[in-house]
């Protein structure tokens, strides 16, 4: 169909070309054509004309024609002539391009021929590609099959190679196991042997193989030989631990740990021999450490300084001697029984190295038992930490530690239990309780739990003993013989000083611990000493002496408690209240002693309201003797009061506080007297005998710099 169309088009183009050659003049032909008026135009229907006019109303061309006044028919003829001219021009242009169109037709026909040939060629290519695709698919299937077979062969080769490697026994391995020395190479060979033994035991398929039947006897012989050889080697190393002056930790770290794989090998392939090695190590270390601790304890015992006996109690009379008690030394030589003093340093030095006994003995030094206790347990902690970590690393067992330390624990208990049962040093016992607390914290920070149960046991044994000794002090106060304790001396009693130092010691030791049970015991002790000191005070014949005795003891107690810390707590507050109340009583006693009439008048008469009972109004005759008596001897009385206070109170500052309080109270009494005189008719007559308040204030300042 395309060929026919192209040929027809070519023929048409040829005709146009021939016409052009013949000089065919279309213009002349067309030029004779003319539009004639339609004879029937008058009969044209006007239907729809209005609509067409409305549509053309907005047309710009029509509007221009109408506005110019031209006739539509003439304008239409002009347009028709223009169209004819354009048509003729187009035909001429088409005729001019006829040769090009013929040439284009020839080119299209050539292209069509070429495309036809290409179509034939591509069809052949398509058939060949289809054939090649089929061949490629076949090759791909063959390749996948060959890849799978190769993979299977490689897997088989790998397993077979591993099997051969795991099951064969190289001659070099036999030489090393049988004849080699136990060293790093030997342990590497043991690892290889271990892998072979595990391989044989783990795989059921291997056990049924014929190859194993040839190799298994040789592997068993090597296993037995290796076990025998490493057992002898380890035993020799364990024997070295028993040699005197051997540094066990260095031997463990630098020698035994290098061969810890031997233990792993024995545990896996020689269980019975491993248990023998384990038992041998436990027995060796048990005996070695027990001997070390026993020797250390014996050396420490030579350094012990006895602090207290069963008779060193707060309420026991210092001069008491008996058949089974020694003469008592003065308190100043035995202050460590009741006062903490420098013993608190043991808490600050809690993590210092353990004592070296022979150095201390050479220096002739003696220590309270808590120092030896700390040193012993410091050595125990360090030794236990090292041994626990070694056992875990070397044997892979933590439980072995407890079997080893059963001996050392027993040795320490044999020493500590008799010491504890004969310990009457309450401060020392509390220090040991605090030491154990700090040691538990140290072991916790180290993350070593091996001493938890032992330290708990020691702590549990210390508390009942402390309670018993503390109760002995409490009983000594409750059951004290006041007749033998009493001394005709208003200065602080030695029992009260003991109590103050004893209590201050425990307050100091409880600052960072907040032990409620200890606070309760101290309160019980305070109540007991309160009762005792009041009983002793009542033995003084004069009330003033009783009060002075109580003030001196309370003041001394407060001073000692303040040394223990800035806040003495409820106990200090209690004694401060007691001091305050007794100071007020003493001031009254002192003033009554020198100004009894003045005080009696102020208390009885100055407070009366004369308006209610005019008959009992205060008169000049009643107050005049008081004024003259005060004016004649008030300075002398103050001097006597000052001397009395200085001789009565051992604490100068306390005496000055009391004197200041007494003079202040005297000034108040005298001021009330002068106020009464001002209210009496004619009282101004006594003004010349009255001592001015300024004079009294001036005199008071002479005796009190802090007034």
From Swiss-Prot:
Pfam families: Vps52_C, Vps52_CC. Residues 181-203 form a coiled coil. It is a peripheral membrane protein. Keywords: Coiled coil, Endosome, Golgi apparatus, Membrane, Protein transport, Transport. Disruption phenotype: Lethal when homozygous. In hemizygous plants, male gametophytic mutants characterized by very short pollen tubes. Male-specific transmission defect. Acts as a component of the GARP complex that is involved in retrograde transport from early and late endosomes to the trans-Golgi network (TGN). The GARP complex facilitates tethering as well as SNARE complex assembly at the Golgi. Required for pollen tube elongation and other polar growth. The gene is VPS52. GO terms for biological process: pollen tube growth; protein transport; sexual reproduction. Belongs to the VPS52 family. Mostly expressed in roots and flower buds, and, at low levels, in seeds, whole inflorescence and mature flowers. Also detected in pollen. Present in pollen, buds, leaves, and roots (at protein level). GO terms for cellular component: endomembrane system; endosome membrane; GARP complex; Golgi apparatus; Golgi membrane. It comes from Arabidopsis thaliana (Mouse-ear cress). It is found in: Golgi apparatus, trans-Golgi network membrane; Endosome membrane; Golgi apparatus membrane. This is Vacuolar protein sorting-associated protein 52 A.
């Amino acid at each position: 169909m395309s060929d026919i169309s192209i040929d027809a088009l070519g023929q048409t183009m040829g005709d146009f070309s021939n016409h052009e050659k013949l000089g065919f003049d279309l213009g002349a032909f067309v030029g004779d054509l003319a539009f004639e008026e339609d004879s029937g135009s008058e009969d044209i229907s006007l239907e729809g004309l209005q609509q067409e006019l409305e549509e053309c109303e907005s047309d710009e061309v029509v509007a221009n024609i109408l506005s110019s006044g031209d006739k539509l028919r003439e304008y239409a003829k002009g347009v028709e002539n223009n169209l004819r001219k354009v048509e003729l021009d187009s035909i001429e242009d088409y005729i001019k391009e006829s040769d090009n169109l013929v040439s284009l037709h020839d080119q299209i026909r050539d292209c069509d021929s070429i495309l036809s040939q290409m179509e034939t060629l591509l069809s052949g290519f398509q058939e060949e590609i289809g054939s090649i695709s089929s061949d490629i698919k076949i090759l791909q299937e063959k390749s996948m099959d060959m890849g799978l077979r190769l993979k299977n062969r490689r897997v088989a080769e790998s397993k077979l190679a591993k099997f051969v490697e795991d099951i064969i026994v190289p001659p070099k391995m036999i030489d090393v196991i049988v004849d080699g020395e136990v060293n790093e190479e030997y342990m590497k060979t043991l690892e290889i042997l271990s892998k072979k033994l595990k391989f044989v035991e783990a795989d059921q398929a291997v056990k049924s193989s014929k190859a194993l039947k040839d190799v298994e006897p040789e592997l068993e012989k090597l296993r037995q030989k290796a076990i025998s050889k490493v057992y002898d080697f380890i035993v020799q190393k364990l024997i070295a631990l028993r040699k005197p002056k051997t540094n066990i930790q260095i031997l463990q770290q630098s020698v035994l740990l290098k061969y810890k794989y031997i233990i792993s090998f024995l545990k896996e392939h020689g269980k019975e021999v491993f248990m023998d090695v384990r038992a041998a190590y436990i027995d060796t270390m048990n005996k070695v450490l027990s001997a070390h601790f026993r020797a250390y304890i014996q050396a420490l015992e030579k350094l012990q300084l006895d602090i207290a006996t069963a008779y060193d109690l707060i309420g026991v009379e210092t001069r008491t001697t008996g058949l089974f008690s020694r003469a008592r030394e003065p308190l100043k030589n035995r202050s460590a029984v009741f006062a903490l003093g420098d013993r608190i340093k043991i808490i600050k030095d809690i993590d210092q190295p353990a004592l070296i006994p022979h150095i201390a003995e050479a220096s002739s030094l003696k220590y309270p038992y808590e120092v030896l206790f700390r040193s012993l347990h410091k050595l125990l902690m360090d030794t236990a930490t090292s041994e626990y970590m070694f056992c875990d690393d070397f044997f892979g067992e933590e439980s072995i530690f407890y079997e080893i330390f059963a001996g050392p624990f027993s040795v320490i208990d044999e020493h500590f239990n008799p010491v504890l049962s004969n310990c009457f040093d309450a401060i020392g016992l509390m220090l040991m309780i605090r030491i154990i607390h700090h040691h538990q914290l140290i072991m916790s920070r180290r993350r070593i739990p091996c001493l938890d149960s032992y330290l708990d046991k020691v702590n549990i044994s210390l508390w009942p003993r402390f309670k018993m000794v503390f109760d002995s002090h409490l009983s000594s106060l409750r059951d004290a013989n006041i007749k033998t304790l009493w001394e005709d001396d208003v200065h602080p009693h030695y029992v009260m000083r003991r109590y103050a130092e004893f209590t201050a010691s425990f307050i100091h030791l409880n600052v960072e611990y907040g032990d409620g049970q200890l606070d309760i015991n101290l309160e019980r002790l305070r109540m007991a000493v309160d009762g005792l000191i009041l009983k002793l005070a009542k033995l003084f014949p004069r009330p003033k002496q009783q009060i002075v005795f109580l003030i001196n003891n309370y003041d001394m107690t407060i001073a000692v408690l303040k040394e223990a810390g800035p806040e003495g707590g409820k106990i200090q507050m209690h004694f401060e209240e007691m001091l305050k109340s007794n100071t007020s009583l003493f001031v009254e006693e002192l003033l009554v002693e020198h100004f009894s009439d003045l005080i009696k008048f102020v208390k009885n008469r100055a407070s009366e309201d004369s308006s209610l009972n005019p008959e009992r109004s205060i008169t000049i005759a009643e107050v005049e003797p008081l004024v003259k008596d005060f004016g004649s001897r008030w300075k002398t009385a103050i001097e006597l009061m000052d001397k009395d206070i200085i001789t009565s109170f051992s604490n100068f500052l306390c005496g000055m506080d009391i004197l200041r309080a007494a003079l202040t109270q005297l000034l108040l009494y005298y001021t009330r007297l002068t106020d009464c005189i001002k209210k009496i008719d004619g009282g101004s007559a006594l003004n010349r005998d009255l001592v001015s308040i300024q004079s009294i204030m001036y005199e008071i300042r002479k005796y009190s710099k802090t007034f």
